[in-house]
Amino acid sequence: ISSSKMKKAKKILSDTEPYFYNWMTVSDVGKYYEDFFEDFSMEKYRQMISRMELTEDMKAKKLSSGMMAKLKIAVTMAREARLYLLDEPLNGIDLLARDQIMKSILEAIDPDVTLVVSSHLVDELERVADAAIFMKDGILANQCMVEELRINQHKSVVDLYREIYGHGGEEVC
């Protein structure tokens, strides 16, 4: 997206903390978001929770961390936007749930939508990312197109991560 389009684009941020009341069911969460956000699609929400194997009668307070992450992604991706910002959506989630969440996100977004994911799980995102941006001490440390990095520099995003943040590109174990 060009910078002028980005200024006009509708942006959605998914925070690391859930904002659901303990009494809510998965269905209640959808209704709550539908009442507060006119860009929220209940149809898309139901598709997302189905993809993520959540049922509408599940209680929010009883969800595991992986299921809670799925619910947060479902409400975020059920909103219409040109730019989605996901803050650590895979943090603390087991491997199978991470795979399911990433698959659901990729199936849910339109090709003309921009998805920005902040994460320390670089290896998980490398296989689906077009570009990588690295911040260090609040400053842009590096940015690259993932495929160009592989072809031109014969490096992975993980290699570049290690160079920027330590270990000189060497694996520790």
Where in this protein do the model-derived segments appear?
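H-loop/switch region of ABC-family ATPase nucleotide-binding domains
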Residues: 118-120
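ABC-family P-loop ATPase nucleotide-binding domains
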Residues: 15-71
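Helical segment within the ABC ATPase nucleotide-binding domain
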Residues: 98-111
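Catalytic Walker B motif of ABC-type/P-loop ATPase nucleotide-binding domains
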Residues: 84-88, 93
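A short, surface-exposed alpha-helical micro-motif characterized by mixed small hydrophobic
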Residues: 125-127
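ABC ATPase "signature
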Residues: 143-144
